[in-house]
């Protein structure tokens, strides 16, 4: 059955199978160097070995080798890759097979093994021509006669012995026979060839079973395949030549279109990268991360911080109302503007301002000097700080980065935005209003200045109506030595000095009627001013003297909270 090993058979069974098989088995047993072989005979001379019938020994060895090779090939064809027994157990093929007559061995041959005799004969009697022929044929016989490597459970010594025996037998037989080219150069077809086994190799009936098992193992070893060994030093092995090249598949039109699109994208990306590289060549290379070396003399770049998103908040501290772009800025503002004490004083004699931080003091100290290191590249105007230059540059560029989130008002400076944001919260910031036009102001003094500038007639009329009117011609307008007022008569204005109108002409003084309407004005420049004692002066001043009306602010009635400042004071 396939896959099963054949058990060794006894000598009696071998005799029953046939005499020719026993003869082949005996021939192979005679050639095998066993462990129980007879010891070698004493050394003989070369002439005695030649006279012992070298030609017959050569024929015997050649016949044995041919029989073994024939049986091995036949079994390979019938049962591929199976464990098979020795060729001695199978009968020879062909009905006309006649074994050759066996020659009785001589006494000298019984003393020495046939293998040693063949070796000695070849070494002594071989011609130079035969040696050259054997050397040329040797590479071809190796592929036929080399035995296969043993498995792990078989002995390696037996494998080497069988290889040596087969190679020596084929050499000796080919040197004596004329069929050298047929055996070595071409491999015969097993189905068309008949092999003859000589009769001289018939084994006697007394072969032990142990010897038969050893012979069977040797034949199995010779028939097995050589296992693969990966030798890294083998330069002739080229695995890429053994592989079958896959057939190229036909590419569809879609694949070509996708490839064309990819090529276009790659070309566009390459062009963009080239443009970026050209732009970056002008710029300085980016600084590498890590610690700064001691020998690095390049200027230190400021640390970049990401700006937080804009979230306008207002400072709720009393009297502040500053608008900031993020709650984090608000915390910083409250800490350094309201909680931290001002301990840095400006050393300038005419200043004396206080600051919370030293850098604020250093920035302020530049204003007391005439040093202007920051120059505008558009108009060549110089500034004392880089911040002032940056704000000024926005005038040329038209940039207004700050914007009111309520009405969209844009400006360049944060102070302008803070001033603008107060308009949207008029109830808290503009608590003082004009009672004539209703305009609101942040300070009370701004209302008084507004009335004196925008509504002077109404202010004078209200003042004279409340005071019943009086003509002032005193030179002491500051009230340091006030003259007593005389009572009015017949609804006319009363002079402060005796005979004030005697030497005065029409149009040189102010005369008010009882209704509070003026008839004429004194010559000179009219003005309304607040004196030191809280009185109001309305009149004209000249180099010769000053004339006008002096009124108490307590008699103004509804406008008692209004304080009138000099018209030179700044207003909105």
UniProtKB/Swiss-Prot annotation:
Q: What class of enzyme is it?
A: transferase
Q: Where is the composition biased (Acidic residues)?
A: 209-225, 272-284
Q: What ranges does the record give for the region Interaction with MAP3K14/NIK, renumbered to this chain?
A: 340-370
Keyword Repeat among UniProt keywords: yes
Q: What is its EC number?
A: 2.3.2.27
Q: In which pathway does it act?
A: Protein modification; protein ubiquitination
Renumbered to this chain, the Low complexity biased-composition regions fall at 61-70, 143-162
| Zn finger residue spans: C2H2-type | 313-338, 344-368, 374-396, 402-424, 432-455
Gene Ontology MF term list = ubiquitin-protein transferase activity; zinc ion binding
Question: From start to end residue, where is composition biased (Basic and acidic residues)?
Answer: 1-12, 122-131, 226-247, 254-271
Which residue windows are transmembrane per the record? none
Reaction(s) catalysed by this chain's protein: S-ubiquitinyl-[E2 ubiquitin-conjugating enzyme]-L-cysteine + [acceptor protein]-L-lysine = [E2 ubiquitin-conjugating enzyme]-L-cysteine + N(6)-ubiquitinyl-[acceptor protein]-L-lysine
Q: What's the superkingdom here?
A: Eukaryota
Modified residue annotations for Phosphoserine: 86, 106
Record GO biological process: activation of NF-kappaB-inducing kinase activity; protein K63-linked ubiquitination
Which residue ranges are recorded for the region named Disordered? 1-308
InterPro entries, per the entry: Zinc_finger_trans_reg (IPR051061), Znf_C2H2_sf (IPR036236), Znf_C2H2_type (IPR013087)
Q: Which GO terms describe its cellular component?
A: nucleolus; nucleoplasm
Which family does the record claim for this protein? Belongs to the krueppel C2H2-type zinc-finger protein family.
What is this protein for, i.e. what is its function? Answer: Atypical E3 ubiquitin-protein ligase that mediates 'Lys-63'-linked ubiquitination of MAP3K14/NIK, leading to stabilize and activate MAP3K14/NIK. It thereby acts as an activator of the non-canonical NF-kappa-B2/NFKB2 pathway. May also play an important role in cell proliferation and/or anti-apoptosis.
Print the miscellaneous field: In contrast to other E3 ubiquitin-protein ligase, does not contain any domain (RING-type zinc finger or HECT domain) known to mediate E3 ligase activity.
The protein's assembly and partners: Interacts with MAP3K14/NIK.
Read off the PANTHER family from this record.
E3 UBIQUITIN-PROTEIN LIGASE ZFP91 (PTHR46179:SF11), ZINC FINGER PROTEIN (PTHR46179)
Its protein name is: E3 ubiquitin-protein ligase ZFP91
Which organism is the protein's source?
Answer: Mus musculus
